[in-house]
Curated annotation (Swiss-Prot):
Family to which this protein belongs: Belongs to the UPF0337 (CsbD) family.
Protein name stated in the entry: UPF0337 protein Atu4724
Organism the protein comes from: Agrobacterium fabrum (strain C58 / ATCC 33970) (Agrobacterium tumefaciens (strain C58))
PANTHER family according to UniProt: UPF0337 PROTEIN YJBJ (PTHR34977:SF1)
Domain of life: Bacteria
InterPro entries from the UniProt entry: CsbD, UPF0337_stress_rsp, YjbJ, YjbJ_sf
Length: 67
């Protein structure tokens, strides 16, 4: 997985992230700024997910982006 693609295109990706994880706020997305670790932490915080589930959900979401 090449997370640099997400990070490098964060402005475009924010909408897709928000579609998947609607509890994330615009402020959350600004703080995340494309950083996977920040995204994992905010998803865990907003949804109460365990770390393993969060990582799997992000991997699944990334895989559906068609890269």
């Amino acid at each position: 997985m090449d997370w640099n693609r997400v990070e490098g295109n964060w402005k475009q990706m924010k909408g897709k992230v928000k579609e998947q994880w609607g509890k994330l706020t615009d402020d959350d997305l600004d703080v995340i700024n494309g950083k996977r670790e920040q995204l994992e932490g905010k998803i865990q915080e907003r949804y109460g997910y365990e770390k393993d589930r969060t990582k799997k959900d992000i991997d699944d979401w990334y895989g559906r982006q068609g890269w």
